């Protein structure tokens, strides 16, 4: 079996790791970075991912897609999506199935399709390091992701050409990375994971028995729409408001200016983790009739903290719920681990330390721990790691809608997965021939307040008074946290099964089409690379030939020189086009035309070599004379 890589598909940054021996190792990307910006940009004929995409965002804001993870598995009408529409420079549109999609270069795309571009970059990074093709991956998701979001993440993996061996929760992965090489008995850890777009808290127990470690998640909670991007937005709004007060210009209507402000806000936020004050200077941020305008705003750490205090406070509520669900108090927590880039903010660290009554561990890299844990799980699945057992949980309760619009739970939240549960239901009316099974996820009693995961019908029920037929509903929750549901009429034996796919989501046909598009793009990318290489070769050939013509001087006959110049001119014309074969042919033609020039260059080189040899011989003679004189002087002295 080939290597199974671990991928942390993050909102702001992504990271890939692999098990190297018995230790997880983070792999650097082509730019030499250990993390890759989760940014995808679409330009004319090219798709950029990571830093190259981020660099051109200011000049291409509407086609540069970031924080796509906030949209994955979401419906267009979701409150969180509607909030994002207000602040994102790119277009968020409604798909035919009601999902939140994006639009770039006039093309509508599903969130998993865009995320697949980031996963492809991670896959290529691992393949370059390992020197072999990679097909298997463990991908992490926020613990509080629902079924639709998990399914959409798996879809992204498929579109990227990966077989997703397991979906695991980010805090659990971080605990794996942290606890793998720790000894010293049992411990209960709290993983506080505040990333770019999501927040999770997991309480995890690590037991060690005869060298085998069991990582058991006791409880998990969180907020899938709280993260560093929200902190950035608060600072962006403050900077824009200050500029408006000073200049009377609202930058929110200018996408280019807003992209510059976004980058400056992100930079200022990071700087304020290590300094108490910073300046945001953006010369020529915009202009009006009176001339260019510059932004110059001083931001103190205290100001930033006042802007985001309620967001940090919002992250503390799930901590209380998770502890209560695990039936523990803060005193039972052995270690606190911080994961996610936003946990570098001193205020976050202070509030978490205050809540738990202890400082968080400093020996965990918040940007890399999740990918490393995913690589460990990859090693477990590949059979390379034998002494680790991971027991994860489902973050939300699962059930069906029953009479009166009530949600009846079959699987309670924080149940260890995989798990199976069944319950017998009956009909609500006399002679009812079909029932609709409406599957829900959430904690509210009223069905309409929970997340609808999908519905299906069981038909052909024999006519009988209400309450008589026995319909057995079975929930089968797999290790990825994805639900399979079946309903069976116990009298007739008729059964209906589905893998839950929300009324939205991508169908197998959609995914297959996107896989084919990705393959076609792969072919297009390959052609683009080959064309770029041909153009580079043409440039080198033109430059090298012109240099040799100059060096040959009068030794090159005039008619030969004309032939070469004509061939160079034809190659320059071909180089401007998109036909690789034409460029290759003209390179060949120039090589043929420059044959005489090559001969002259060779003769000149040989002549220089001969001159060099003569000079060496002459030098050698002189050296001999000096030695001889030296010898004679010694003889005289005798």
Swiss-Prot record:
One of its GO terms (molecular function) is unfolded protein binding. The lineage of its organism: Bacteria, Pseudomonadati, Pseudomonadota, Gammaproteobacteria, Vibrionales. This is Chaperone protein DnaK. Residues 603-618 have a biased composition (Low complexity). Acts as a chaperone. InterPro entries: ATPase_NBD (IPR043129), Chaperone_DnaK (IPR012725), Heat_shock_70_CS (IPR018181), HSP70_C_sf (IPR029048), HSP70_peptide-bd_sf (IPR029047), Hsp_70_fam (IPR013126). NCBIfam families: PRK00290.1, prok_dnaK. It comes from Vibrio campbellii (strain ATCC BAA-1116). The modification Phosphothreonine is found at residue 198. Induction: By stress conditions e.g. heat shock. Residues 603-638 are annotated as: Disordered. Residues 624-638 have a biased composition (Acidic residues). Belongs to the heat shock protein 70 family. It comes from the Bacteria. The keyword Chaperone applies. Keywords: ATP-binding, Chaperone, Nucleotide-binding, Phosphoprotein, Stress response.
């Amino acid at each position: 079996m080939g290597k199974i890589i671990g991928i942390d598909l993050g909102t702001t940054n992504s990271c890939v790791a692999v098990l190297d021996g018995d230790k997880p190792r983070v792999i650097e990307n082509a730019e030499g970075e250990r993390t890759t910006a989760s940014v995808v940009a679409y330009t004319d004929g090219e798709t950029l991912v990571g830093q190259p995409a981020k660099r051109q965002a200011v000049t291409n804001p509407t086609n540069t897609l970031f924080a796509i993870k906030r949209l994955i598995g979401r419906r267009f009408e979701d409150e969180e999506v509607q909030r994002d529409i207000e602040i994102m420079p790119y277009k968020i549109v409604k798909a035919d199935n009601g999902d939140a999609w994006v639009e770039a270069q006039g093309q509508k795309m599903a969130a998993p399709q865009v995320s697949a571009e980031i996963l492809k970059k991670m896959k290529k990074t691992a393949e370059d390091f390992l020197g072999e093709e990679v097909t298997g991956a463990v991908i992490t998701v926020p613990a509080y992701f629902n079924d639709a979001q998990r399914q959409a993440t798996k879809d992204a993996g498929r579109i990227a050409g990966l077989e997703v061996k397991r979906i695991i929760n980010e805090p659990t992965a971080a605990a794996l990375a942290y606890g793998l090489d720790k000894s010293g008995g049992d411990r209960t850890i709290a993983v506080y994971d505040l990333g770019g777009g999501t927040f999770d808290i997991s309480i995890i127990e690590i037991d060690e028995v005869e060298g085998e470690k069991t990582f058991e998640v006791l409880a998990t909670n969180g907020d899938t729409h709280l993260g560093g991007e929200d902190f950035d937005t608060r600072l962006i709004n403050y900077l824009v408001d200050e500029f408006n007060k000073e200049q009377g210009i609202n930058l929110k209507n200018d996408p280019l200016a807003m992209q510059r402000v976004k980058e400056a806000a992100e930079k200022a936020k990071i700087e304020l983790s290590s300094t108490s004050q910073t300046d945001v200077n953006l010369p020529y941020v915009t202009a009006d009739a009176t001339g260019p305008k510059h932004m110059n705003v001083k931001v103190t750490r205290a100001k930033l903290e006042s802007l985001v205090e309620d967001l940090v406070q919002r992250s503390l509520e799930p901590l209380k719920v998770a502890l209560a669900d695990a039936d523990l108090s803060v005193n039972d927590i052995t270690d606190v681990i911080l994961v996610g880039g936003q946990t570098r903010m001193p205020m976050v660290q202070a509030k978490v330390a205050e809540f738990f009554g202890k400082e968080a561990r400093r020996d965990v890299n918040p940007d890399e721990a999740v990918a490393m844990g995913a690589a460990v799980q990859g090693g477990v699945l590949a059979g390379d790691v034998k002494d680790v057992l991971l027991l994860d949980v489902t973050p939300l309760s699962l059930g069906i809608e029953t009479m009166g619009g009530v949600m009846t739970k079959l699987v309670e939240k924080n149940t260890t997965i995989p798990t199976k549960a069944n319950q017998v239901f009956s009909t609500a009316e006399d002679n009812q021939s079909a029932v609709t099974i409406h599957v829900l996820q959430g904690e509210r009693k009223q069905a309409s307040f929970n997340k609808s995961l999908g519905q299906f019908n069981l038909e052909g029920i024999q006519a009988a008074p209400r309450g008589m037929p026995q319909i057995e509903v079975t929930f089968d929750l797999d290790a990825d946290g994805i639900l399979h549901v079946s309903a069976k009429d116990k009298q007739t034996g008729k059964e209906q099964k589905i893998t839950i796919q929300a009324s939205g989501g991508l169908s197998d046909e959609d995914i297959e089409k996107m896989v084919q598009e990705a393959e076609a793009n792969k072919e297009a990318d390959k052609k683009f690379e080959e064309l770029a290489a041909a153009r580079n070769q043409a440039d080198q050939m033109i430059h090298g030939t012109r240099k040799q013509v100059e060096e040959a001087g009068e030794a090159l006959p005039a008619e030969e020189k004309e032939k070469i110049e004509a061939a160079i001119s034809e190659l320059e014309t071909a180089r401007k086009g998109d036909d690789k074969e034409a460029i290759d042919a003209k390179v060949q033609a120039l090589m043929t035309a420059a044959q005489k020039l090559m001969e002259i260059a060779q003769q000149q080189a040989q002549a220089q070599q001969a001159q060099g040899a003569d000079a060496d011989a002459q030098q050698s003679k002189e050296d001999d004379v000096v030695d001889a004189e030296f010898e004679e002087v010694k003889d005289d002295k005798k």
